Amino acid sequence: MTTSASDRPEAGVDRKLLDILVCPITKGPLEFDAARQELISRGAKLAYPIRDGIPIMLPEEARKLG
């Protein structure tokens, strides 16, 4: 199975993966921030980093939002 370039945002993260990921704390939706390479959870006020195209969904690795 191949993934076309149109299925990938700038970081190389598969768009389908982003569609199914949820915040591990709130189980709510995540927003992709392409500029910062983060997945934002508004409910938990956390930003999960994306490193080398891999979302790091560990709360202890997340950045707290103001």
Curated annotation (Swiss-Prot):
Q: Which SUPFAM superfamilies match?
A: Trm112p-like
Q: Which cysteines are joined by disulfide bonds?
A: none
Any one GO CC term of this protein is: cytosol
Where, if anywhere, are coiled coils annotated?
A: none
Gene3D superfamilies in the record, alphabetically? 2.20.25.10
Which InterPro entries does this UniProt record tie to the protein?
Answer: Trm112-like
Q: Which family, according to UniProt?
A: Belongs to the UPF0434 family.
- Protein name, per record: UPF0434 protein RPC_0266
Organism annotation: Rhodopseudomonas palustris (strain BisB18)
